[in-house]
Amino acid sequence: MIEVLAFPTPNSVKVPIALEEMELDYRLVPVNLRQGEQKTDAFKAMNPNAKVPVLIDRSVPGDGDVVLSEPAAILVYLAEKTGQLLPKNGPHRGKVFEQLVFHASGLSPAFLQAFLVANQSSPQPEAQARAIGG
């Protein structure tokens, strides 16, 4: 059985989407970031960075549980496990990795920054006026 520890974030939703596309059975385990559940010792034993998502694959015979914590690594692991969604070689495989890296290093940090500015900073009317050309 595959378990996905997650919270409704752009990074977390990538994993269940892939699992659904691959038609793999999994169990979604909610981790409440607002209550700090990702900062517990038990969670940090799975991911010392205290971030979601975390994937636990208990279906690997003889190897014990596979525990992964970075969305791109999880997606590549699932693709290679199933032989789906990732070309075996060639330029199309490169394009998939290009998108994975873009999401990990460009898009996800930008979403986080926008969220923090919108939800955790005080209003700055002068900056807002400059941004809209006022």
What are these regions (language model features)?
Residues 1-130:
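GST-like domain detector, emphasizing the conserved glutathione-binding G-site
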Residues 133-134:
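Aromatic-anchored helix/helix-loop segment that forms the rim or "lid"
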